[in-house]
């Protein structure tokens, strides 16, 4: 039997009067909440719209991103990058009808030095900015001597100057480097012969990790007045400049005593920017994609595209034309013993012309030091052009003329360019086009994909056509008398 329960009604506490908001404040709060929602919605739509606009711009510019790999999205950079092509035109070499007028290499270098505030990193092959190596008083050496003088002023002003240079395999003047050491610069010699059986053939500057020069010019007074050179200066482009600094840091590491190439490079040297995920930049006010490649493959940390792979990718994706200006072109490992055939680039050019109908123009330098075997390979490539194959390949030799005094200057009067341009891409490198430069020798290249009038690509195309159509370009069957003894291949 259940016990009898006593129920008692609980008393509920009386409610305190609520602090009610006046109706006008409630309405104001609701209005503010509604406005905030609309602002948030507008911001979301703006972000989505901007992304769609940029995607549309790049699709409009490039059609698709097949050139860089499937389904890859470029990593963005918001620097207002400015690119300027710079040239060294040898004294006495005139282009009277040319519309191109680019700044000189010496002007660009002196401008970079004048603007350096915190750091300057230089990767270089050798140093002869004075003409001590010729034991002459050559007036055209003055520009190189001025560059050296300005370099010596930087370290005393607090600029951290670092120079990575290839360790010479034999006697070589070190006067310039000794002067820079005395001024406070740091110098490390990279023994590429020991590391990869090659040399450090790279030629670039990085200033304040914001601006840089990359091109064909050596730290040689002749590269400013007696040798034809081409490079690019990138201003206010810290994203690319910092990435180029990573390549320099690898050289700097290898310049330490007893160093060796790591089996796996530390993550410090890795990059996010490469052929598959190029950097999305605004270049000279228009959209562009860019990345830096490096050689040889053992010097490519995670993410870095090897130079040869980048070069071949540009060749393989050309659909209209391929214009190439290079000092040496040899489908061989010319510094290997015994010599070995190396057709990687040659096959790519033949395939482009034969399979896709791409117009190929190859402008190779000819001077007193040209490798004599090069002629046979150039004739073989040019022979592909006939009425049966409909392959449009042409090869010319560029000869820099020299008067009696200029002819006495050693290792001068040559077209030292190392670039390629297609209807889609620009490739500016530091290597000659033969096998060892990509398998053993250290080099760097800048690749830019940009269309439109006034683009870097269109400017480089104009320079190539100026040279190709100039009186300094000669067919392979030209008479040797037309160039005197300045060309070994005729």
Curated annotation (Swiss-Prot):
Glycans are attached at residues 97, 132, 236, 284, 387. It is found in: Endoplasmic reticulum membrane; Lysosome lumen; Early endosome membrane; Late endosome membrane. Disulfide bonds join 77-239, 81-237, 366-487. It holds the Pfam family PLDc_3. PROSITE patterns: PLD. SMART domains: PLDc (SM00155). GO terms for cellular component: early endosome membrane; endoplasmic reticulum membrane; Golgi membrane; late endosome membrane; lysosomal lumen. GO terms for biological process: immune system process; inflammatory response; lipid metabolic process; myotube differentiation. The chain crosses the membrane at residues 39-59. It catalyses: Exonucleolytic cleavage in the 5'- to 3'-direction to yield nucleoside 3'-phosphates; a 5'-end 5'-dephospho-ribonucleotidyl-ribonucleotide-RNA + H2O = a ribonucleoside 3'-phosphate + a 5'-end dephospho-ribonucleoside-RNA + H(+); a ribonucleoside 3'-phosphate-2'-3'-cyclophospho-GMP + H2O = a ribonucleoside 3'-phosphate + 2',3'-cyclophospho-GMP + H(+); a 5'-end 5'-dephospho-2'-deoxyribonucleotidyl-2'-deoxyribonucleotide in single-stranded DNA + H2O = a 5'-end dephospho-2'-deoxyribonucleoside in single-stranded DNA + a 2'-deoxyribonucleoside 3'-phosphate + H(+). Keywords: Disulfide bond, Endoplasmic reticulum, Endosome, Exonuclease, Glycoprotein, Golgi apparatus, Hydrolase, Immunity, Inflammatory response, Lipid metabolism, Lysosome, Magnesium, Membrane, Metal-binding, Nuclease, Phospholipid metabolism, Repeat, Signal-anchor, Transmembrane, Transmembrane helix, Ubl conjugation. It comes from the Eukaryota. Residues 1-38 are cytoplasmic. Homodimer. Interacts with APP. The catalytic domain contains two conserved PLD phosphodiesterase HxK(x4)D(E) motifs that accomodate the phosphate group of the nucleic acid substrates, with one nucleophile histidine residue forming a phosphohistidine intermediate and the other histidine protonating the leaving 5'-OH ssDNA/RNA fragment, resulting in the cleavage of the phosphodiester bond. The homodimer has two independent catalytic domains arranged at the dimer interface. PANTHER family: 5'-3' EXONUCLEASE PLD3 (PTHR10185:SF16), PHOSPHOLIPASE D - RELATED (PTHR10185). 5'->3' exonuclease that hydrolyzes the phosphodiester bond of single-stranded DNA (ssDNA) and RNA molecules to form nucleoside 3'-monophosphates and 5'-end 5'-hydroxy deoxyribonucleotide/ribonucleotide fragments. Partially redundant with PLD4, can cleave all four nucleotides displaying higher efficiency for ssDNA and RNA fragments initiated with uridine and guanosine residues and lower efficiency for cytidine-initiated substrates. This is 5'-3' exonuclease PLD3. The lineage of its organism: Eukaryota, Metazoa, Chordata, Craniata, Vertebrata.
């Amino acid at each position: 039997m259940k016990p009898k329960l006593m129920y008692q009604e609980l008393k509920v506490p009386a409610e305190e009067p609520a602090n009610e908001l006046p109706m006008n404040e409630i309405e104001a709060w609701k209005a503010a909440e509604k406005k905030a929602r609309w602002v948030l919605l507008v911001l979301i739509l703006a972000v989505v719209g901007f992304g769609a606009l940029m995607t549309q711009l790049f699709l409009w510019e490039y059609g698709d991103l097949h050139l860089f790999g499937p389904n890859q999205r470029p990593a963005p950079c918001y620097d207002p990058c400015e690119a300027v092509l710079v040239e060294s035109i040898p004294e006495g070499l005139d282009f009277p009808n040319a519309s191109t007028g680019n700044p000189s290499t010496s002007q660009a270098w002196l401008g970079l030095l004048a603007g350096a505030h915190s750091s300057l990193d230089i990767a270089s092959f050798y140093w002869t900015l004075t003409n001590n190596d010729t034991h002459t008083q050559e007036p055209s050496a003055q520009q190189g001597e001025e560059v050296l003088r300005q370099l010596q002023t930087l370290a005393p002003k607090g600029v951290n100057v670092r120079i990575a240079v290839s360790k010479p395999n034999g006697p070589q003047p070190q006067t310039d480097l000794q002067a820079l050491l005395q001024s406070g610069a740091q110098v490390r010699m990279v023994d590429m012969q020991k590391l990869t059986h090659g040399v450090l053939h790279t030629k670039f500057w990085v200033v304040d990790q914001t601006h840089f020069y990359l091109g064909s010019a050596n730290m040689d007074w002749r590269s400013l007045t007696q040798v034809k050179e081409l490079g690019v200066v990138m201003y206010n482009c810290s994203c690319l400049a910092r990435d180029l600094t990573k390549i320099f840091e690898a050289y700097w590491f290898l310049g330490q005593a007893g160093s060796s190439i790591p089996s796996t490079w530390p993550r410090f040297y890795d990059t996010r920017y490469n052929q598959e995920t190029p950097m999305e930049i605004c270049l000279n006010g228009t959209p562009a994609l860019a990345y830096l490649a490096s050689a040889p493959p053992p010097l490519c940390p995670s993410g870095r595209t090897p130079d040869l792979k980048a070069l071949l990718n540009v060749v393989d994706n050309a659909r209209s034309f391929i214009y190439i200006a290079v000092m040496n072109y040899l489908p061989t490992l010319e510094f290997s013993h015994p010599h070995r055939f190396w057709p990687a680039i040659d096959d790519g050019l033949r395939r482009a012309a034969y399979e896709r109908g791409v117009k190929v123009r190859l402008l190779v330098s000819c001077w007193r030091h040209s490798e004599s075997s090069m002629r046979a390979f150039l004739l073989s490539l040019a022979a592909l052009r006939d009425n049966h194959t409909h392959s449009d390949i042409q090869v010319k030799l560029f000869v820099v003329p020299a008067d009696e005094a200029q002819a006495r200057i050693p290792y001068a009067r040559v077209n030292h360019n190392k670039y390629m341009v297609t209807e889609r891409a620009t490739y500016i490198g530091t290597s000659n086009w033969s096998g060892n430069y990509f398998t053993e020798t250290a080099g760097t290249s800048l690749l830019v994909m940009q269309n439109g009038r006034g683009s870097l690509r269109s400017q480089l195309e104009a320079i190539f056509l100026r040279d190709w159509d100039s009186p300094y370009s000669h067919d392979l069957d030209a008479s040797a008398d037309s160039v005197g003894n300045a060309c070994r291949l005729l």
